[in-house]
Amino acid sequence: MADPEGTNGAGMGCTGWFEVEAVIERRTGDNISEDEDETADDSGTDLLEFIDDSMENSIQADTEAARALFNIQEGEDDLNAVCALKRKFAACSQSAAEDVVDRAANPCRTSINKNKECTYRKRKIDELEDSGYGNTEVETQQMVQQVESQNGDTNLNDLESSGVGDDSEVSCETNVDSCENVTLQEISNVLHSSNTKANILYKFKEAYGISFMELVRPFKSDKTSCTDWCITGYGISPSVAESLKVLIKQHSLYTHLQCLTCDRGIIILLLIRFRCSKNRLTVAKLMSNLLSIPETCMVIEPPKLRSQTCALYWFRTAMSNISDVQGTTPEWIDRLTVLQHSFNDNIFDLSEMVQWAYDNELTDDSDIAYYYAQLADSNSNAAAFLKSNSQAKIVKDCGIMCRHYKKAEKRKMSIGQWIQSRCEKTNDGGNWRPIVQLLRYQNIEFTAFLGAFKKFLKGIPKKSCMLICGPANTGKSYFGMSLIQFLKGCVISCVNSKSHFWLQPLSDAKIGMIDDVTPISWTYIDDYMRNALDGNEISIDVKHRALVQLKCPPLLLTSNTNAGTDSRWPYLHSRLTVFEFKNPFPFDENGNPVYAINDENWKSFFSRTWCKLDLIEEEDKENHGGNISTFKCSAGENTRSLRS
């Protein structure tokens, strides 16, 4: 049997009854106080001041209402600030603000629509247009939750706790429209400030019917210089746009100006060629002063120079009445719009490029590619070269052919013809006396030097190797290098003597030089190069070819050791013609050499000593020195008609 509820130890003799002893506080006959007198009359005088009707309560209520309204206004201001900073959340923030105000004005609807809130919010987010940036939906949803949790719930709790009646609800309803208006204005300001370029491009396409970016080639760097620029400006006064036609003349060689109206004034399109190259920063500063608009209201890019469509646009609009054109039309527009140029640009002639490289004496592939590309504006063949997808192969083939032609031409010439060709390519105005004065300063007889130099140039056996020796800083290398530079000879170094190909440059040279020959190098020459010093036929190992047999060109050597008298190399004594430079090379007070030796001075020297050096050959006497013919590797154009 279950224990009786509320008892402990049932069945222990408890019958359920207990005795209570009364506590007596007042006995019969004691005086009764007025507060406990039940027989006294109740007149109600003691409740007169029970309700306080003073002004303090009304003031406190008004204060609480004001605080509630201030809290609502603070929430609206915070929401507007968030909308202004984050433009892509503007639509979502606006709906959140409406929900906050609606829930604040109608607290009863909050609990009813609480279950439908998540579904409705997700549908609103899905309907938003993507701005093109990543994670838009996730960030927007987070923004809505933050707005509701920070503003909506706080405002709702404040309204419920404040106890404000219908007046508070009316004030909330009247602020809904103002909140929406402020939000739209902030959104407009954000669009104009944060995405100005996109807004300008949109207005440009709306006004001109063509995308601005289709006419230009964007530059990433603001420091890149260019002479031609394409500019569009937005929000320009009509009077300023009209005055631009006159103000821009002093800065430009060519201008193409179009002006159309839009909702914020005039929007212009300007194609301009400046008198000198300018970068984007300089152009923006100049146009900002001329148009009286900030630099952010302009888009500045260089035009497309190889687009035929863009060139046709500028060509056609230049003939219409909406354009104001001044100056000479740029050559790239003419090249892309004239029919003959279009035909020529599609045809590339390698022989013409080889002829150009030959005439300009360019044999290095890098120089050929760089300088020929610069001719694209004036040479149709160079423009076709730039359009080719095989530029590297073309440059390589051009360099190879040019080097072959130059090598064959040099082999064909005698030493006299080669010196004559070098003199023709050197400017006049030189003086031969510094060379003679330097030889006399080093105590060298000019007549003896001239006789040895004559045999040296002709390559007479045992006389085709000249040694200039002496102490350091006497001008040995200065004298020898100046001669090699004038005659376009080759310089070989003994540091490469362990290579099989270190003598390869001698196969293409009319004269060679080994500078600063050391005792180790003299030993190598004595062991392996005696026949080379003789001027006889030698065999040279050349890359990618079989051994080449050729006559060694004259060799000019400089050294601090006189191998012509040193007993360590007795077999070189008869093979070397030795001249000693004993005196230090003189300099003036400014550090310039007293005896200046350059190409012009060597030209004057050979001109004065031409006969003494016996450089005139029989063919030169018959043809009066005009035996060198002009080389042509490209086919000439026949300008004669078929009937002639």
From Swiss-Prot:
Belongs to the papillomaviridae E1 protein family. ATP binds at G470, P471, A472, N473, T474, G475, K476, S477. It is found in: Host nucleus. This is Replication protein E1. ATP-dependent DNA 3'-5' helicase required for initiation of viral DNA replication. It forms a complex with the viral E2 protein. The E1-E2 complex binds to the replication origin which contains binding sites for both proteins. During the initial step, a dimer of E1 interacts with a dimer of protein E2 leading to a complex that binds the viral origin of replication with high specificity. Then, a second dimer of E1 displaces the E2 dimer in an ATP-dependent manner to form the E1 tetramer. Keywords: ATP-binding, DNA replication, DNA-binding, Early protein, Helicase, Host nucleus, Hydrolase, Isomerase, Isopeptide bond, Nucleotide-binding, Phosphoprotein, Ubl conjugation. GO terms for biological process: DNA replication. It comes from Human papillomavirus 33. Residues 444-594 form the SF3 helicase domain. Residues 312-644 are annotated as: Required for E2 binding. GO terms for molecular function: ATP binding; ATP hydrolysis activity; DNA binding; DNA helicase activity. The lineage of its organism: Viruses, Monodnaviria, Shotokuvirae, Cossaviricota, Papovaviricetes. A motif (Nuclear localization signal) lies at residues 86-88. Gene3D superfamilies: 3.40.1310.10, P-loop containing nucleotide triphosphate hydrolases (3.40.50.300), Zinc finger, large T-antigen D1 domain (1.10.10.510). Transmembrane segments: none annotated. Signal peptide: none annotated. The gene is E1. It is an enzyme of class 5 (isomerase). GO terms for cellular component: host cell nucleus. Phosphorylated. There is a cross-link at K551 (Glycyl lysine isopeptide (Lys-Gly) (interchain with G-Cter in SUMO)). Can form hexamers. Interacts with E2 protein; this interaction increases E1 DNA binding specificity. Interacts with host DNA polymerase subunit POLA2. Interacts with host single stranded DNA-binding protein RPA1. Interacts with host TOP1; this interaction stimulates the enzymatic activity of TOP1. Its main location: host cell. It catalyses: Couples ATP hydrolysis with the unwinding of duplex DNA by translocating in the 3'-5' direction; ATP + H2O = ADP + phosphate + H(+). Residues 179-345 are annotated as: DNA-binding region. InterPro entries: Helicase_SF3_DNA-vir, P-loop_NTPase, PPV_DNA_helicase_E1_C, PPV_DNA_helicase_E1_N, PPV_E1_DBD, PPV_E1_DBD_sf, Rep_E1_papillomaV, Znf_lg_T-Ag_D1_dom_sf. The keyword ATP-binding applies. Its EC number is 5.6.2.4.
